[in-house]
A protein has these predicted regions:
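N-terminal secretory signal peptides that target proteins for export/translocation
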Residues: 1-2
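Bacterial N-terminal signal peptides
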Residues: 5-16
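Short, low-complexity disordered leader/linker segments with a strong preference
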Residues: 15-23
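Eukaryotic scaffold repeat domains enriched in small/polar residues
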Residues: 22-364
Length: 364
């Protein structure tokens, strides 16, 4: 079995500002260790193939949800669907895929239907405490977030396709990237997004607007602070009520209270250019939620940070196509056992699982 263990971050590669500390030297202190599971997930049924995997989530049953882009398969990948068929394999899988812990596909659905506007480019998925499934999109016309039951029944749409009115508008979105629902208040936090530069909050039941803010808790575009870049790529709640927001292009994680009060920020791999270093984050599931995991699709690492101060402890993964390597790692999620799941876009087109192997000295 191929093993990918957490690798210690190099000094200076990932520095934190505004309340965070510098990275540890290789081998300093304990950190979580991981081993890639090359057999997860199982092959899809029905001759299906996964396209770009643009979101991944774990629900309260420890099932893993992937939103993928069927239209990103090339002709040779979907050769069985051509007329006449080019090859024996394959056909695009439905956009929304639910896997059990063994990696078996247990449910699939998605696509355009009555009463809602399915995104042109799928992007981001979250499953809330009531088993509702939320999705977004990032095409130039995708300015909506959709809510479904786990069976795929449509429930709610926030925003409208092809309608966006900027950061000050409270009824429209701007290419929303991802979302998170607070089980304590049933509020929906949206990372908005690829066009807008803010976090916006709605009632998850009614879709009523609650509040929004930009970088440092200021109004979007406030010249007194460094604004969020595009995209604002994630918004992730911890159990203590802190909200972690991915300012991807600026290589930083900003931390807020749920009311938008700015707390601190962490900068990860500050020299990173291109697509930036902070694509998605999730927290560990130990009682204090000690660790913060950061998917870095430009450097193709998953960084492990101490959640209280942003200090980088370790990383795993590198650019490549083998099990445990990444090409444009786009999202991640953590299950109740501490296992980490990742999703890759561009030509990566896969989901992977990394088994949690306890906390110990990290390996170089």
């Amino acid at each position: 079995m191929i093993r990918i263990f957490a690798l210690a971050a190099l000094v200076g590669l990932a520095l934190g500002f505004a309340g965070s500390a510098t990275a540890q030297r290789p081998g300093d202190g304990p950190g979580p260790r991981f081993e890639v599971d090359p057999w997860w997930p199982k092959p899809l049924p029905s001759n299906w193939l996964m396209g770009q995997a643009a979101g991944i989530a774990v629900d309260r049953h420890d099932h893993i949800w992937v939103i993928q882009r069927p239209r990103t398969l090339t002709e040779d990948e979907r050769g069985a669907t051509l007329n006449p068929p080019r090859s024996l394999c394959c056909a695009p899988a439905p956009p929304v895929l639910e896997f059990d812990q063994d990696g078996v596909l247990v449910r699939s659905w998605g696509g355009q239907g009555a009463g809602y506007e399915w995104p042109l480019i799928e992007h981001g998925i979250f499953v809330d405490h009531q088993d509702n499934v939320w999705i977004g999109g990032n095409d130039a016309k995708d300015h909506q977030v959709l809510k479904f039951t786990r069976e795929g029944k449509f429930l709610l749409q926030i925003g409208k396709a092809d309608q966006t009115r900027g950061d000050a508008d409270t009824a429209h979105l701007g290419r929303p990237a991802n979302m998170n629902v607070d089980p304590a208040t049933n509020e929906l936090f949206i990372a908005d997004g690829y066009k807008n530069h803010r976090v916006i909050v709605f009632d998850a039941q009614t879709g009523a607007y609650k509040r929004h803010w930009g970088a440092n808790g200021r109004p979007p575009g406030d010249p007194s602070v460094k604004s969020f870049g595009n995209p604002v790529h994630c918004a992730r709640l911890a159990k203590d009520g802190l909200l972690y927001v991915c300012d991807r292009a600026n290589n930083r994680i900003q931390v807020f209270k749920k009311d938008g009060t700015f707390v601190k920020e962490f900068v990860v791999a500050p020299a990173t250019r291109g697509g930036g270093s902070v694509w998605d984050v999730d927290v560990s599931h130990d009682a204090p939620q000690t660790w913060l995991y950061n998917a870095d699709g430009e450097n193709n690492h998953v960084w492990t940070l101490l959640r209280d101060n942003g200090q980088v402890v370790s990383k795993f993964g590198r650019n490549g196509r083998q099990a445990g390597q990444f090409h444009w790692v786009h999202n991640l999620a953590v299950d109740s056992k501490g296992n980490v799941y990742t999703a890759e876009v561009d030509t990566g087109k896969r989901a992977q699982r990394f088994l949690f192997k306890g906390v110990g000295p990290v390996e170089n």
